[in-house]
Amino acid sequence: NDTLNMLYEAGLKMEAKDFAVGLRVCHEQEKINLSQDGEKYYQSLPAASYKLTHNTDSGIGVYSFCMCPGGYVVNASSVSGLLSINGMSNHDRGGRFANSAIIMTVGRDDFPKDEGVPECMRGVAVKEELERKAYVIGNGAIPYETLGEYKEGVLGKHSHEMNITDDFRFEPDEAFRGQTMHAPVHEILPDKLSRAFLEGMENFGHRIKGF
């Protein structure tokens, strides 16, 4: 962001472009293996991956990106007061959880018409605002919640989903690297993108059981 601002102030000719934003989702790697490889083979094959896409009724494309088998969600922030995350897998892809970004396109027509921000920098302003929200709700840590909580827009209403059965316990340290906080992730994205995210997740759930 600082680099783009510096180049703009130096007089470099610039123009706005569409970009993608989204959220990272985590699932037990074993469930992904079972869905992708089948019951007969899933225990003997390496950690499975997936690639998912969906075009929403509103015309927004939703797709998985940078899927990390047996990996971790990591804090990739580089600017004070802003939060961005990424995913990674170790060489053995041996982590208990898989994760991937589920992202949506933000078009130039979606950029706010803020007269105080140059037109070519309005996409950067959108990105910074989302990263600022993420930082605030997580108090600088990686915020997380269940999909049920996200759907209802109420933190804590579906927290039991993290501990569904005696053989499933969600421990943040097994899915994340860095500090975490159970927080209202549903407050980050604007409504238009949030609805697209949920529609995409519902579609993906019909293709990978439990997604």
Predicted regions and their residues:
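Residues forming the flavin
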Residues: 1-211
